Regions:
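Short, intrinsically disordered, charge-balanced linker/junction segments flanking boundaries
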Residues: 1, 44-45, 799-811
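Short, conserved beta-strand segments of beta-strand-rich sandwich/propeller modules, principally
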Residues: 3, 222-224, 477-479
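Glycine-centered tight beta-turn/hairpin loop motif at sheet-sheet or coil-to-beta transitions
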Residues: 8-10, 330
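Canonical phosphoinositide-binding patch of PH/PH-like domains
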Residues: 11-18
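Eukaryotic regulatory linkers and domain-edge "caps" enriched in S/T/P and acidic residues that sit
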Residues: 18-23, 27-465, 469-472, 485-642, ...
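Hydrophobic residues within the alpha-helices of tandem HEAT/HEAT-like
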Residues: 482-486, 648-654, 716-724, 779-783, ...
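Buried hydrophobic core positions in alpha-solenoid tandem helical repeats
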Residues: 629-630, 761, 783, 799-802, ...
Length: 812
C-alpha cells in the first residue's frame, strides 16, 4: 500500500495507490500543477515548502499563498491571505496533546510505578498538636508565705486521648506536673537509687508540655484529664471538703491541709483516684482544632467506674450534659491546646530520646512526645524510622473476695517490677519509666498502682511503661507484689503492721504474682489472667498450679485454690520485637540458621507461613523483612528455598498494591535496598532473583503468582537494576568493558526471562488486557534501564526479539 496526503485550505485529503508506479504518476501530475520539482521536493522558484521523504510522502508548504506563487492558476491568489488566516485559526482548535497519548506516558495507569517520585523516608505522624499544662486551682486553697492561694496538697495529672466512636484509648498516658513549688515540698525527697539521677534529668522531671498525634482525627476524639492525690481514704470523704462553700470552705481548709500534710509524709508512695475532666478536640474529620471548646467541669471520680470502658461511657454521657449528674468539684483548669509550631525546639520522643535540634544545657523545659497507639491497619502504619522498644502493662482487676489467707486485705496496691531472674537475691531492673511530680530519675525499679479504699476486688486504670532490653530471654518476667496499705495514721505510726523489705510500717504484703515476658519465644501482648501466691520462693518461675490441689515446681501456696485472680493487659510498641507470630518466627529462625539441610528445610517452612502474616506488621518491618528475604536468595543452597522466597516476595508486593501501599515499596527500592556483598558467596541478588522469577513464568507455574508478578513486575526489575549497579560499584567495574561486567550465565537468564515473559503477555492480550499492558510497560522500563549497565548490543537484540514476537494485530 502506498499513499500520501494533500492539505488544501482547511481539509486534508489522503490518497492511496495500489502500486508504487501509480503513486508516482499521481505525484507527477500534482507537481506539474503546483510547480513543485518532484526529484528535489522543492518548488522550482526555490520557495519554501516541499515533500517529506519517507514511506508515506506528504505534500508540505509553509502556507497556502506560498504554494500558489508558481501556480498556473493565479486567480486563486485573490483569496489566499484570508484562507491562510482561517487555516491558522482552525489549526489551534481541538488540538490534542499527542505526547500524553503515548502508551509509555507515566500518566497512564500502570506506568507510574517506575517513574513515581519518592519522598525521603521520615517519621510520619497524624494530626499533631501541642498541649501545655499551666495550672490547676481548686476553690479549696491555702496561702503559703508570700504566695497567695495555692492548693492545699499536691495533685498528679494524667492526660490521654480516647476515641469514643471506636471505644478505645488511642494514646499512652502523659503525666504532667502543675504543683506550685511550695506544694511539691510537702512530698519527701526520694531515697538514693544506684545509677540514679542523670546530669540533665531534672529538666524533664516536671513536664508541662506534650505533643499528641491522632492519625484519624474526628469530633469524637477527647482529651481526658485524670486527677490523683496522695492516698488518704475513700474518694467521697476526700472530695467532700472541696465541694463546700462559704464559711464551711474556709473552716475546712486548715483541717484538710493538716490531714494532707500527714498523708504526704507517710503515704506519699501511694495515690488514689480523685477527679476527672474531658475536652473535645476536633471540629471535623480533617483535624481542625476546635478552639472554642473548653474543658468540662471537674467531676468527682466514681469508685465503681474506674476502668477505661467505664470512662468511655462517662465521656459519652458528658457530651449530653442534661443527662450527666456526676458531682462537680469547683476548680479552674488552665491548659492550652494549640497547633504544633514548626520551630519547636528541645523535644523528646516517647522513649526519651532527644529530637534535633536539642540543647541539653538549655534551661528551656523539653516537650515530650506522647506515643499514639496507631490502629493496626495498612493505611495507618508506616515503616519504623525511630527506635522504640516499650512494653505497656495494665493491671485491670484483682479479686480477693473469696481468698481466706489475708482477711484484712482491703486497701490493695500492686507494685510492679521487671526482673531478669527469679532468685531471691536478684534486684529488679531499672527500666520502668518514672512518673513525674518530684525530682526522680527518668527510670525506676518499681512503680505502684492507685489504691481504692476498702475494696477487696479493686479495678485499676494505671499504665506501667517499661523500656525493654534489646535481648530478651526466658527468665525475664514481671513480678507483681500486693500490699495492704493502712490509711489509719495512728496505727501505722505505732507499728501495727509488720515492716517487710525495709518498707514503711503502713504496708503489709498480701500476695505475689508473676508473668514471664516470653511465651513460645514471643512477647505476650494480650489480655490474660494469672493466679496469685502467698509467697515468691527462690525459683518461683518454675512453679505453677497443676490443678486438683497439685503444685508443679517449688512449693508455693496459691490463693483461692489457684484461680486466676489478677487480670492484666499488655501492649508492645517496639521496632525490635514483632507482634506477628509468622514474622517473628522467620526472624528468630534466620538468626539461628546454620546452612545445614535441616536448617534449610526449616527456612522453607518459615517462608511458607509468611503468606498469612498481617499486612500492618509487614509494612512496619518492611525494610528488614525484604532485606532478610533477599539475603536468603544469595545464601541458600536449595532451589526450593529460592522458589519459596520469590513466591513470598511476589505475594508481599501484590498485597501491598492491593491495600494501596505501593509507596513503601518505592521507598524501599530507592532508599533502603543495598546490594548484599558477602565474603565466601559468589551469588548476587540480581542473578538469583532473575533465576527465581523464571520458575514462575514457565508453563505449569502457579497462575496466581504469575499474574501477580506480571502486574507488579516493576518492583522486581527495579531491584535487579539497582543490584546490577551496586555490583559494579562494589567490585570496581564501573570503568570496565560492558561485555565483561556480568557473567555469561546472567545474560542467559535475561534471555530466558524475555523468552518466557513475551508469551505470558500474548496469552493475556484479550482476556486480561490490562495485565498484559502493565507487564509490557514494566518490561519496557526494564530494558531501558539495562542500557545503563550491560552490553548495549545485547539490549538491542532483546528489543529486536521482543518486537518480532508481536503481530500487527497484537499491537493495536
Amino acid at each position: 500500500m502506498h499513499g500520501f496526503e494533500i492539505r488544501i485550505q482547511d481539509k486534508i485529503y489522503s490518497l492511496v495507490a495500489d502500486t508504487q508506479s501509480e503513486m508516482e504518476s499521481w505525484l507527477s501530475v500534482l507537481c506539474k500543477v503546483t510547480g513543485v520539482d518532484m526529484t528535489t521536493g522543492k518548488s522550482k522558484s526555490a520557495s519554501s515548502g516541499g515533500w517529506f521523504s519517507g514511506k508515506n510522502r506528504v505534500l508540505k508548504s509553509t502556507n497556502f499563498r506560498e504554494s500558489l506563487k508558481q501556480s498556473k492558476h493565479p486567480e486563486l491568489m485573490e483569496f489566499a491571505r484570508e484562507t491562510d488566516q482561517v487555516n491558522a485559526k482552525r489549526r489551534q482548535e481541538g488540538r490534542n496533546k499527542i505526547f500524553s497519548l503515548s502508551f509509555l506516558s507515566p500518566n497512564i495507569n500502570g506506568a507510574g510505578d517506575e517513574v513515581k517520585e519518592v519522598d525521603i523516608p521520615h517519621e510520619r505522624f497524624g494530626k499533631r498538636f501541642l498541649v501545655q499544662c499551666d495550672d490547676l486551682k481548686f476553690r479549696l486553697s491555702r496561702s503559703f508565705d508570700s504566695v497567695s492561694s495555692v492548693n492545699i496538697e499536691p495533685f498528679f495529672i494524667t492526660l490521654a486521648l480516647f476515641d469514643v466512636k471506636e471505644n478505645k484509648k488511642i494514646s499512652e498516658d502523659f503525666h504532667c506536673d502543675v504543683n506550685d513549688s511550695v506544694v511539691s515540698e510537702m512530698l519527701p525527697s526520694p531515697e538514693n537509687i544506684s545509677n540514679g539521677v542523670g546530669e540533665y534529668e531534672h529538666h524533664f522531671s516536671f513536664p508541662k508540655k506534650a505533643i499528641f498525634s491522632v492519625t484519624f482525627p474526628h469530633p469524637d476524639v477527647y482529651l481526658v484529664l485524670r486527677i490523683e492525690k496522695v492516698l488518704q481514704g475513700g474518694i467521697t470523704s476526700c472530695t467532700e471538703p472541696y465541694m463546700k462553700s462559704g464559711d464551711a470552705l474556709k473552716k475546712g481548709a486548715a483541717k484538710a491541709y493538716r490531714s494532707a500534710e500527714i498523708a504526704c509524709q507517710t503515704l506519699w508512695r501511694y495515690r488514689m483516684p480523685f477527679a476527672l475532666a474531658t475536652r473535645p478536640l476536633f471540629k471535623n474529620n480533617q483535624g481542625d482544632l476546635d478552639d472554642e471548646k473548653e474543658w468540662s467541669p471537674i467531676y468527682k471520680q466514681d469508685s465503681g467506674k474506674l476502668s477505661d470502658d467505664e470512662l468511655l461511657k462517662l465521656v459519652e454521657d458528658m457530651a449530653g450534659k442534661e443527662k450527666f449528674k456526676q458531682q462537680i468539684i469547683p476548680a479552674t483548669i488552665k491548659m492550652n491546646v494549640t497547633s504544633l509550631p514548626n520551630d519547636l525546639a528541645n523535644s523528646m520522643t516517647a522513649s526519651l530520646l532527644p529530637v534535633r535540634p536539642f540543647n541539653d544545657k538549655s534551661k528551656i523545659q523539653p516537650t515530650l512526645e506522647v506515643q499514639e497507639f496507631v490502629p493496626a491497619i495498612p493505611e495507618a502504619v508506616h515503616p519504623h524510622m525511630v527506635y522504640a522498644n516499650n512494653f505497656y502493662v495494665y493491671p485491670l482487676m484483682l479479686n480477693f473476695n473469696n481468698q481466706k489467707v489475708f482477711s484484712k486485705a482491703r486497701n490493695i496496691a500492686v507494685t510492679v517490677e521487671f526482673k531478669e531472674n527469679d532468685t531471691l537475691a536478684s534486684s529488679p531492673l531499672k527500666c520502668i519509666y518514672n512518673r513525674s511530680g518530684c525530682v526522680v530519675p527518668s527510670f525506676t525499679t518499681s512503680t505502684n498502682t492507685t489504691v481504692l479504699h476498702h475494696c477487696t476486688n479493686p479495678t485499676f486504670y494505671d499504665e506501667i511503661k517499661i523500656c525493654l532490653p534489646v535481648h530478651l530471654h526466658n527468665r525475664h518476667h514481671l513480678l507483681f507484689t500486693f500490699y495492704h496499705v493502712s490509711c489509719e495514721q495512728k496505727k501505722a505510726a505505732s507499728g501495727a503492721h509488720a515492716s517487710i523489705k525495709g518498707k514503711p510500717a503502713v504496708e503489709m504484703q498480701v500476695g505475689y504474682a508473676w508473668l514471664p515476658l516470653l511465651k513460645d519465644g514471643r512477647i505476650v501482648h494480650s489480655e490474660l489472667s494469672i493466679p496469685v501466691a502467698t509467697s515468691a520462693p527462690d525459683g518461683y518461675l518454675n512453679s505453677r498450679f497443676g490443678g486438683l490441689g497439685k503444685n508443679i515446681g517449688p512449693d508455693v501456696r496459691w490463693l483461692d485454690g489457684g484461680k486466676p485472680l489478677l487480670k492484666i493487659s499488655t501492649k508492645v510498641v517496639s521496632t525490635v520485637h514483632t507482634q506477628d507470630v509468622h514474622v517473628d518466627s522467620l526472624f528468630r529462625h534466620l538468626q539461628e540458621a546454620d546452612g545445614t539441610p535441616a536448617s534449610e528445610r526449616e527456612t522453607s517452612n518459615s517462608l511458607k507461613h509468611l503468606f498469612v502474616a498481617d499486612n500492618s506488621v509487614i509494612i512496619k518491618y518492611l525494610p528488614t523483612i525484604l532485606n532478610k528475604l533477599l539475603h536468603v536468595l544469595i545464601v541458600t543452597k536449595l532451589d526450593e528455598v529460592t522458589k519459596d522466597t520469590v513466591r513470598v516476595l511476589v505475594r508481599f508486593v501484590s498485597q501491598l498494591h492491593d491495600v494501596n501501599r505501593s509507596d513503601v515499596l518505592h521507598s524501599y527500592v530507592k532508599y533502603s535496598f543495598v546490594t548484599d556483598q558477602l565474603s565466601g558467596f559468589d551469588k548476587t541478588v540480581y542473578e538469583e532473583l532473575t533465576k527465581g522469577l523464571l520458575k514462575f513464568l514457565k508453563p505449569g507455574a502457579d497462575p496466581t503468582i504469575t499474574s501477580s508478578f506480571l502486574k507488579h513486575a516493576w518492583w522486581f526489575f527495579e531491584v535487579i537494576l539497582k543490584s546490577m549497579g551496586g555490583h559494579l560499584i562494589q567490585n570496581g567495574k564501573l570503568q570496565s568493558n560492558r561485555e565483561t561486567r556480568y557473567s555469561k550465565g546472567f545474560y542467559e537468564s535475561l534471555e530466558h526471562l524475555l523468552q518466557l515473559f513475551v508469551p505470558q503477555i500474548l496469552r493475556r492480550l484479550k482476556e486480561e488486557a490490562r495485565v498484559a499492558k502493565e507487564a509490557n510497560i514494566h518490561m519496557a522500563y526494564f530494558v531501558k534501564g539495562c542500557f545503563t549497565y550491560i552490553d548495549r548490543g545485547f539490549v538491542f537484540q532483546m528489543i529486536s526479539y521482543y518486537n518480532e514476537q508481536f503481530k500487527d494485530a497484537d499491537t493495536q
